[in-house]
């Protein structure tokens, strides 16, 4: 199966069917945490925050690159605390990710000094996904030219499209130019800048020449198509069925992480492509749950904003937890050399991000559901929701960066 339009359609339909068949009931197979276990984890988090206070206090005085590096370290430390549990393989992976992240921030700021903390962290999130795939496929965990190029590609182009001074016609021409550049075609006519896109694309081409790695560029075209189609979700959707709307989300999420897989190894077998596509779908659904407030304010349609109009989010969130577990397990056995599988670590990280969103949006859930799901949380939900507020107090408007997926 390839990242052709037909291949993407087949994968989208497969995961749409899996999502529809997944029960919206509390999971019965996740690890449960005792009250004593939660209390111990909370003590560890408190200690972590206390150690971070000196840097938090001078956060606003830091250069943007230093702030991004600090947030990366905080993300790593929290991830180790919540999911690593002293596993040497997990500890090594987090250490390697932190090293790659530091290098990423330096290279990103060198490429474009105007990139904001938000831009860098958005791009760094993809680098972490890329690193997790490297480890799952028994590749060294590191920054590569193509991972830097792809991770920065959409923050840079989004900034161009969202920036002032460009007419709708110019933005439409720019999107058409993006497609042609991805296809390797020359673009004629005057261009009022390209958002750095062509230079980033050249980073990918330096590692994966077009003539030798056509699947890499098919995957890049697939995510470009998916992003364009998903713009339907930014407007009125009443004329579209629920399955169609879900398919737009699934296609966008799946193709975005499939690109990472191709950039790790240059080619993917059908099993690896299916597993990584599913990984991307999970991350997209989690993003949508975490962004519930912002999407509602902006009028963007997601499975969660639509469900929230008719009642509590109990069922759709329970479905997401079950879907996450079923899908992430497909990452098992991807390593051709019998290397370490990170599926358990990835599953734990994803579940924690879902629970953090539940804690923040507790008013959107019934008391019965909150009590049921708290059994699977390493922290009390009341503590987890308050933790978000504590970080916000110290980092002001930057608080969401630490807890973003």
Predicted regions: what they are:
Residues 287, 310-316, 381-383:
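Alpha-helical membrane-embedding segments
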Residues 186-215, 313-358:
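Primarily interfacial, aromatic-capped hydrophobic alpha-helices that serve as membrane anchors
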Residues 251-255, 280, 341-357, 368-375:
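Alpha-helical transmembrane segments of multi-pass membrane proteins
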Residues 1-147, 156, 222, 226-238, ...:
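Conserved N-terminal diphosphate/IPP-binding helix and adjacent helical/loop segment
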Residues 87-153, 159-160, 164-177, 181-296, ...:
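All-alpha helical catalytic cores of prenyl diphosphate-utilizing isoprenoid enzymes
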Residues 299-312:
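Nucleotide-sugar-dependent glycosyltransferase catalytic core
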Residues 73-81, 181-182, 200, 204, ...:
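Hydrophobic core of alpha-helical transmembrane segments in multi-pass integral membrane proteins
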Residues 352-405:
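Acidic, carboxylate-rich catalytic segments that either coordinate divalent cations
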